[in-house]
């Protein structure tokens, strides 16, 4: 009987037969479902049970139902909050005081090694703003320069020489060692100039040291722009200097060629005069001989001279005489001096005339067509 009572208690926890059958129908295979459908009325019961389960699972929430808590995602922080080891490590982290560097043993060893001593600020010393203003006025470069200019006016070289001569005349004896000589005075003057330069440089350095970073950047930009402008000006001046030097060389070569041609023309004129004198003397001698020979009107020498003169006029001068040395170069006076190109062309013509070259006519035509009568 005891065994029947135990089984009776066990039967109370079992589900009814219908529910077991429904579970079997749910877990059955498609073939079994197909057989049940073919068998009879089990399919409507299965469909109704499925609808009941779906309605229980997806039933709508009503006001009578208690509110459900929102689903929260599991994060690393939520996991660490429940971790005992993490809590033990982080609970005492904020309670530890930071290390005081000044009172540490490492700091004392550091001071002993570097041999540093801390000097306290003496608050008892009074600070006067008037001293700072006086120092600023003393270091003002503009005021220093203006005061120097007002006190000592600039002297010209002639005034300095006159003053030195007066000092030399006023000195009673040159042999006296106590009176300083001219070289000593000049050396003293140079020393004063050097001291003035050094003081101005030191004051400029102090002013630069007192400038801020922004002011230094502005000063640097101004210096760079000034350097750029001065560089461009220097390039222009160098180019102008080269042009002036080239122009000077062309002018010097033209003047030297002109002087050489003029000297050769003078020599040629002198030789021509001597030849004329000799010819005149020979012609007078021939006339005298002709007067002594009344029967002969023409001589062989006279006929040969006439023939030679005709040939010279027809085919030019003989080989010994200069043909192009006495060439006249046409020149038109303009408002200003001749240009460098004109001087170069004239120099070429003068060199050709000096060498008695055959290029003189072609150079003259080019000069007339390009310079005097340009098309």
Curated annotation (Swiss-Prot):
Q: Does the keyword RNA-binding apply?
A: no
Q: Which GO terms describe its biological process?
A: negative regulation of autophagosome assembly; regulation of exocytosis
InterPro entries (UniProt xref): FEZ
The free-text function statement in the UniProt record for this protein reads: Involved in axonal outgrowth and fasciculation.
Binding partners and assembly:
Homodimer; disulfide-linked. May form heterodimers with FEZ1. Interacts with synaptotagmin.
Keywords assigned by UniProt?
Answer: Coiled coil, Disulfide bond, Phosphoprotein
The keyword Coiled coil belongs to this UniProt entry's keyword annotation: yes
Q: Name one GO cellular component term.
A: axon
Q: Which residues form a coiled coil?
A: 156-177, 206-281
Protein family membership: Belongs to the zygin family.
Q: Where is this region: Disordered?
A: 1-42, 265-297
- Protein name per UniProt: Fasciculation and elongation protein zeta-2
Q: Which residues carry this modification: Phosphoserine?
A: 130, 171, 190
């Amino acid at each position: 009987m005891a065994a029947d009572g135990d089984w009776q208690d066990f039967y109370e926890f079992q589900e009814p037969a219908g529910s077991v059958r429904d579970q079997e129908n749910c877990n059955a295979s498609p073939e079994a479902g197909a057989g049940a459908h073919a068998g009879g009325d089990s399919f409507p019961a299965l469909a109704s049970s499925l609808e009941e389960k779906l309605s229980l699972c997806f039933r709508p929430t009503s006001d009578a139902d208690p509110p459900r808590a929102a689903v929260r995602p599991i994060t690393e922080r939520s996991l660490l909050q429940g971790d005992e080891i993490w809590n033990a490590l982080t609970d005492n982290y904020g309670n530890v005081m930071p290390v005081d560097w000044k009172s540490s043993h490492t700091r004392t060893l550091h001071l002993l090694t570097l041999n540093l001593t801390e000097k306290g600020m003496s608050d008892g010393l009074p600070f006067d703003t008037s001293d700072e203003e006086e120092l600023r006025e003393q270091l003002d470069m503009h005021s220093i320069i203006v005061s120097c200019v007002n006190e000592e006016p600039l002297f010209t070289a002639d005034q300095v020489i006159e003053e030195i001569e007066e000092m030399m005349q006023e000195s009673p004896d040159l042999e006296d060692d106590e009176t300083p000589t001219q070289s000593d005075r000049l050396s003293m003057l140079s020393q004063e100039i050097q001291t003035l330069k050094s003081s101005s440089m030191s004051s400029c350095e102090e002013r630069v040291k007192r400038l801020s970073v922004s002011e230094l950047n502005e000063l640097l930009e101004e210096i760079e722009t000034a350097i750029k402008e001065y560089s461009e000006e220097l390039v222009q001046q160098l180019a102008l200097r080269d042009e002036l030097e080239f122009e000077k060389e062309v002018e010097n070569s033209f003047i030297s060629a002109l002087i050489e041609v003029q000297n050769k023309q003078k020599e040629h004129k002198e030789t021509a005069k001597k030849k004329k004198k000799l010819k005149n003397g020979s012609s007078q001698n021939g006339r005298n001989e002709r007067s002594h020979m009344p029967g002969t009107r023409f001589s062989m020498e006279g006929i040969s001279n006439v023939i030679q003169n005709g040939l010279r006029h027809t085919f030019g001068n003989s080989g010994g005489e200069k043909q192009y040395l006495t060439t006249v170069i046409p020149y038109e006076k303009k408002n200003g001096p001749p240009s460098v190109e004109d001087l170069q062309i004239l120099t070429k013509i003068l060199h050709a005339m000096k060498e008695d070259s055959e290029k003189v006519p072609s150079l003259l035509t080019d000069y007339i067509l390009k310079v005097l009568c340009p098309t």
